Curated annotation (Swiss-Prot):
It holds the Pfam family CFAP298. Keywords: Cell projection, Cilium, Cytoplasm, Cytoskeleton. Plays a role in motile cilium function, possibly by acting on outer dynein arm assembly. Seems to be important for initiation rather than maintenance of cilium motility. Required for correct positioning of cilia at the apical cell surface, suggesting an additional role in the planar cell polarity (PCP) pathway. May suppress canonical Wnt signaling activity. Interacts with ZMYND10. It comes from the Eukaryota. Expressed in the trachea (at protein level). It is found in: Cytoplasm; Cytoplasm, Cytoskeleton, Cilium basal body. This is Cilia- and flagella-associated protein 298. Belongs to the CFAP298 family. The lineage of its organism: Eukaryota, Metazoa, Chordata, Craniata, Vertebrata. One of its GO terms (biological process) is cilium assembly. Disulfide bonds: none annotated. One of its GO terms (cellular component) is centrosome.
Length: 290
């Protein structure tokens, strides 16, 4: 199996393995699904952390309004009254004004937070360092765990406009957000290796050869963005160690310059004529005018 270290730009994303005989059409789709799936997990984790702290999403027409404005406009959060967390709620006001402030109790909050940490770990970039391959099954498992935790804490479900529910139903609207810039459409995705685009009409082995023990770094890119930057000759960690070595070397040279003192040359042991004077018996003779 060929090992693919997938990157976006210079940033590591995940490890994937595939046979050399894999069609690049299929491989590009697989890499893109895992890449977008990881983004989805991270978006959900961010929103579920907010859910644990401040409760469900307010209706769009109530977001950002003060209590006085809501009362004046006679607006009502009907879904908020239905979607009550299991075990009761604790009021924690959302300063941003996106959520209704009726957060789950401490026990239910920990259920959400623990699940979020587990889901993050499953698709973390640290899996690259650990040598763990991330598959679409792992992404789906992380999503299922998050869905299960939300159902435990909110058995009545979430409002239809809550971004968590919309993510689970694949109805999320990312337009105008930073997250939209990160997502790559499957039909628009490109894989690059060694400054060459891996054409979808070919097989992986057409580029990397028949050796199934090959490990390559591929970069996923949106079509039309051009070739990604080449990989640096040394890694960021190696560069850091090199800079540290040169810094230490400069400090050592600086100390040597500071200690370059010639006063030691006046010491008796530095006098190369001392032995001669000793044998001639003229040691310690002081000359002074009368």
């Amino acid at each position: 199996m060929v090992v693919l270290h997938v990157k976006r730009g210079d940033e590591s994303q995940f490890l994937l393995q595939a046979p050399g005989s894999t069609e690049l059409e299929e491989l590009t789709a697989q890499v893109t699904r895992v890449y977008n799936g990881r983004l989805k997990v991270h978006r959900l984790c961010t929103e579920i952390e907010e859910l644990a702290e401040h409760g469900v999403f307010l209706p769009p027409n109530m977001q950002g309004l003060t209590d006085e404005q809501i009362e004046e406009l006679k607006l009502k959060d009907e879904w908020g009254e239905k979607c009550v967390p299991s075990g009761g709620s604790v009021f924690t006001k959302d300063d941003i004004g996106r959520r209704n402030g009726h957060a789950p109790n401490e026990k239910m909050k920990q259920v959400l937070k623990k699940t979020v940490e587990e889901a993050k770990a499953m698709v973390s970039k640290k899996q690259v360092e650990a040598g763990v391959f991330v598959t679409m099954e792992m992404v789906k498992d992380a999503l299922d765990q998050l869905r299960g935790a939300v159902m435990i804490v909110y058995p009545m479900g979430l409002p239809p406009y809550d971004p968590i529910r919309m993510e689970f139903e694949n109805k999320e609207d990312l337009s105008g957000t930073q997250a939209a810039l990160e997502v790559i459409q499957e039909s628009e995705a490109q894989l690059w290796w060694a400054a060459k685009e891996l054409r979808r009409t070919k097989k992986l082995s057409d580029y990397v050869g028949k050796n199934e023990k090959t490990k390559i770094i591929v970069k996923i890119q949106q079509r039309g963005q051009g070739a990604p930057a080449r990989e640096p000759l040394i890694s960021s960690e190696e560069h850091k160690q090199l800079m540290l070595f040169y810094h230490r070397r400069q400090e050592e040279l600086k100390k040597l310059e500071e200690n370059d003192d010639d006063s030691c040359l006046n010491s008796p042991w530095a006098d190369n004529t001392a032995l001669k004077r000793h044998f001639h018996g003229v040691k310690d003779i002081k000359w002074r005018p009368r």
